[in-house]
Amino acid sequence: MSARPLRGGLSSAVHALAVALPGGGVERAVLRRYVRPEVVAEEPDIAEREARILRFFEPVDLPTPRLVAVDPAGAETGTPTLLMSLLPGRVDWSPSDMGIWLRRLAEPLPVLHATAVPHAGTLPSFYGYAQNSYDPPSWSLRPEVWSRAVEIFHARHPEESVVCIHRDYHPGNVLWRAGRVSGLVDWPSASIGSPSVDVAHCRANLLGRFDLEVAERFTAIWEELTGNRFNPWADIMIIIGMLDGLRDDPQLNRASVEEALARAVASLGVGRA
C-alpha cells in the first residue's frame, strides 16, 4: 500500500491511498482523518455527518465521492475517519480559457440546487461562521463598509427559497480532466440554504485569487444558466464569515474583496458605501 498527502484539508488530514489487490490490480481511495482536536471537539459528529452527506448525494447526477467506510468516533482508527473513492482529475487555478472555465465551473450548481431537499436531519441549515473578531481588517481603506456588513451579517436572514448547497464551493474543491469537471470534493459543510450562498463562496475565492471582474463573469453565467438573480446578502455572509482568515492572507486581492463588499452593502440599501 502507498499513501500520498493531498493538498487542502484545513480541518483534516487527507491522503490518497493505492492498495495492491491479491488478484492483481490496484484499488485507489481517499482517507480523511479528522486529526485536529479542536475540530472534533466543536463538531464531534463531523465524520458521521460527512458520511451521511455522501450517501445522500450518491444517486445525484454529480461527480461526488462514493463512501466506502466510516469510523465515526475513531473506535478503530483512533480519530474520526472516512474512506471514500478517489475521483479522477486535478484542481485547476490557471485556466487557458477563462470564459470556458467559468462556465464549466458554474454548470454543476444548477444540478446540485435542483436536488430534492431531504428530510430534516440529513443536512443542517446554513449559518454564518462565527469569527474571533469582527473588527475591520487593518488593511481596509473603507472600515465603515466592514462595520455595516457586520451588522447585516448578524441580522435576521432574508426569507428566501432554500435548496441543497455545497457550502464550500470553489475552484479548490473542483477537479478537472481533459478540460471538464471530473469531481466535486470536500462535502462536510453541505447544508440547506440559499443557492446564492454557493455562488458567493465561489465568488469570494475568485475575488481573492483573480479580481472582481472574474467573479462578476462567473455570477452572470450562473444567472444565465438558472434564470435566478444573485442575492448580494450572500456576499456579506461569506466574506464576513471568512474575516479571520482574510486579515493576513498574503495572496488575497484585498481591493477586489473590499469593493465587492462595498457593492453588496450599497445594494442592500445600508447607508452609503
Predicted features along the sequence, with ranges:
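ATP-binding pocket architecture of kinase catalytic cores
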Residues: 4-123
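Generic detector of well-ordered alpha-helical packing
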Residues: 51, 86, 167-169, 187, ...
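A general structural signal marking secondary-structure boundaries and capping sites
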Residues: 61, 71, 90, 112-117, ...
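Active-site Asp-x-Gly
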Residues: 162-165, 175-219
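Conserved catalytic motifs of the protein kinase core domain
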Residues: 26, 79, 160-162, 180
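An alpha-helical support segment within catalytic cores of ATP-dependent transferases
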Residues: 110-167, 263-273
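Helix-rich C-terminal or lid/interface subdomains of diverse kinases
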Residues: 103, 192, 201-273
